[in-house]
Amino acid sequence: MSPATITLLFLLFAIVMFVWEKIPLGVTSMIICVGLVVTGVLDFKTAFAGFIDSNVILFVAMFIVGGALFETGMANKIGGIVTHFAKTERQLIIAIMVIVGLMSGVLSNTGTAAVLIPVVIGIAARSGYSRSRLLMPLVFAAAMGGNLSLIGAPGNLIAQSVMEEMDMSFSFFEYAKVGLPILICGIIYFAFIGYKFLPDKSGEKDSSYDEQKDFSNVPKWKQALSLIILVLTLLGMIFEEQIGIKLCITGCIGALALILTGVISEKNALKSIDLKTIFLFGGTLSLASALQTTGAGEDIAKTVIGVLGENPSPYVLTFVVFMLCCILTNFMSNTATTALMAPICVSIAQGMG
């Protein structure tokens, strides 16, 4: 069996397991990574290169930087302050979407949602509004806000890693060129139309999210310093070219500063790292390498281009890829979809010249 065929079989396995999710996504990725070595498709060094990728290091660092903001209660406080000024339900929906969208752009969108869900539930209880009508806009804003920057969502960095293999990359806020208009349109939609269709579920049962964490014992200096270090870290990333320090190193400096100053303990710093994302990221990069080195990605690209006819329009091809990703992401996570589609899309682009 040729290396290209083996790679395509692993790709099929990945699609099935990512949709089925009977075993964790990270474990599936590691099975693929190890399998590519055992079958001789990739050598050990190439297969596991994804785990020392600069974007994985950036992931780890920003998990800690974001974790400090969550651990100290600063994220909670920011959310509470902004929503405090909203007087009506519609104003509250807009305020929630603005703060969640912006925070998701510079922190983990999943982490932002998890931290602000109890805040919003508390606001709903105090104001008498239905929590379901406030939580749905929060989730949408977190998803849209993740597309404001390179670090907003795991999929963004996966695409960055694939681009870097071709000596190309996205700048820190390049995603915002598309992500910001989407977020703004989403907020406007909910403000004028969407709020009418939000579910109003009465008799909502208590959940683990009803219990808000008490941050009153956290020193004010820790909260302030966590925010200051986050801002300085982001500024360092924005001005990467001017200061000559790579994004991952800037992130590491921010993470180390938080640990050394005692803002976050080493134990909590390690706890804030999402290992599932790291394993998914590192493992699927080995599949991306195999698709490229064996020519399997090129075969897929030729098939797709062939189906669309000779010299297909780039706009048509973009639409097809867009719709395919939209369909896939309803059956598997956004991160898994990006991990599968990014190398294939690159092969298609190269095939079209």
Indicate residue ranges for each PLM-predicted region.
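Short, electropositive, low-hydrophobicity segments enriched in small/polar residues
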Residues: 25, 44, 70, 149-150, ...
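Hydrophobic transmembrane alpha-helices of multi-pass small-molecule transporters
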Residues: 1-60, 64, 177-302, 318
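Transmembrane alpha-helix interface/packing and boundary motifs in multi-pass membrane proteins
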Residues: 14-23, 99-109, 140-151, 236-242, ...
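Membrane-embedded alpha-helical segments and adjacent helix-loop junctions characteristic
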Residues: 27, 34, 38-130, 272-277, ...
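Juxtamembrane and boundary regions of transmembrane helices in multi-pass small-molecule transporters
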Residues: 6, 127-140, 146-158, 162-216, ...
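Short, structured coil/loop segments at alpha-helix boundaries
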Residues: 1-2, 73, 88, 156, ...
